[in-house]
Amino acid sequence: KLMKQGGAALEGSALANGRALSAGSPPVPPGWNRIPPLGRAQEE
């Protein structure tokens, strides 16, 4: 579970980073912060 969560978090970070780079907007960081918790809730 730990490894899966870590992988999911890494994937989410990569996606968030890609979106942030593409969007280049300030409202992106907040979303990135909200993504990890959502992923964890779904994984659990």
UniProtKB/Swiss-Prot annotation:
GO molecular function, one term: chromatin binding
Region: Disordered, residue numbers: 19-44
Keywords for this protein: Activator, Developmental protein, Differentiation, DNA-binding, Homeobox, Nucleus, Repressor, Transcription, Transcription regulation
The keyword RNA-binding appears for this protein: no
GO biological process, alphabetically ordered: cellular response to BMP stimulus; cellular response to transforming growth factor beta stimulus; cerebral cortex GABAergic interneuron differentiation; cerebral cortex GABAergic interneuron fate commitment; embryonic skeletal system development; forebrain neuron differentiation; GABAergic neuron differentiation; hippocampus development
Signal peptide: none
UniProt subcellular location: Nucleus
Lineage: superkingdom: Eukaryota
Any one GO CC term of the record: nucleus
Record note on quaternary structure: Interacts with SMAD4 (via homeobox DNA-binding domain). Interacts (via homeobox DNA-binding domain) with POU4F2; this interaction suppresses DLX1-mediated transcriptional activity in postnatal retina and enhances retinal ganglion cell (RGC) differentiation.
Functional note: Plays a role as a transcriptional activator or repressor. Inhibits several cytokine signaling pathways, such as TGFB1, activin-A/INHBA and BMP4 by interfering with the transcriptional stimulatory activity of transcription factors, such as MSX2, FAST2, SMAD2 and SMAD3 during hematopoietic cell differentiation. Plays a role in terminal differentiation of interneurons, such as amacrine and bipolar cells in the developing retina. Likely to play a regulatory role in the development of the ventral forebrain.
Domain notes: The homeobox DNA-binding domain is necessary for its nuclear localization, transcriptional and erythroid differentiation activities.
Family assignment from sequence similarity: Belongs to the distal-less homeobox family.
Protein name: Homeobox protein DLX-1
Species of provenance: Rattus norvegicus (Rat)
Gene: Dlx1
